[in-house]
């Protein structure tokens, strides 16, 4: 059962990658900016999560 469920997931991911690649050629800068923004947001969220934990400790 597990293998059957994993196969379609990989196929769908590959399909998305192909579409992203075509779009990426047109706007690679947009994707890069988005990832950088996401990373900054992720770090900020992590800091907010870690800070209270340290105070509780």
UniProtKB/Swiss-Prot annotation:
KW Repeat (keyword) present: no
InterPro entries, sorted: Flu_proapoptotic_PB1-F2
Bias type Basic and acidic residues, positions: 20-34
Region of interest (Disordered), ranges: 1-36
Gene Ontology terms: cellular component: host cell cytosol; host cell nucleus; membrane
Subcellular location per the Swiss-Prot or TrEMBL entry: Host nucleus; Host cytoplasm, Host cytosol
One Pfam family in the UniProt entry: PB1-F2
Compositional bias per record (Polar residues), positions renumbered to this chain: 1-19
Keyword annotations: Host cytoplasm, Host nucleus
Gene Ontology process terms (BP): symbiont-mediated suppression of host cytoplasmic pattern recognition receptor signaling pathway via inhibition of MAVS activity
Other observations noted: Is not encoded in all strains, and seems to be dispensable for replication.
Family (UniProt): Belongs to the influenza viruses PB1-F2 family.
Protein purpose: May play an important role in promoting lung pathology in both primary viral infection and secondary bacterial infection.
Name under which the protein is recorded: Protein PB1-F2
Organism: Influenza A virus (strain A/Brazil/11/1978 H1N1)
Name of the coding gene: PB1
């Amino acid at each position: 059962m597990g293998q059957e469920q994993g196969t379609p997931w990989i196929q769908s991911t590959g399909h998305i990658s192909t579409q992203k690649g075509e779009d990426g050629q047109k706007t690679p800068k947009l994707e890069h900016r988005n990832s950088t923004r996401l990373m900054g947001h992720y770090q900020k969220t992590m800091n907010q999560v870690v800070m209270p934990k340290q105070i509780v400790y």
